[in-house]
Amino acid sequence: PSEQYQPYPEQQQPFLQQQPLELQQQQXXLVLFLQK
């Protein structure tokens, strides 16, 4: 189970790293819009 648990987080990390790029651009904008 330990070996299966490791590959899981590794696959989830790249998926989350690719999403933040698009989310950061949208959030940013939103954060700047809200801060303004």
From Swiss-Prot:
UniProt keyword terms in alphabetical order: Allergen, Seed storage protein, Storage protein, Vacuole
Listed GO CC annotations: aleurone grain; vacuole
Cellular compartment(s): Vacuole, Aleurone grain
Any one GO molecular function term: nutrient reservoir activity
Major localization class: other
Keyword Mitochondrion: no
Function per UniProt: Seed storage protein. Serves as a source of nitrogen, carbon, and sulfur for the young developing seedling.
Family statement drawn from the similarity comment of this UniProt entry: Belongs to the gliadin/glutenin family.
Quaternary assembly: Monomer.
Protein name: Avenin-A
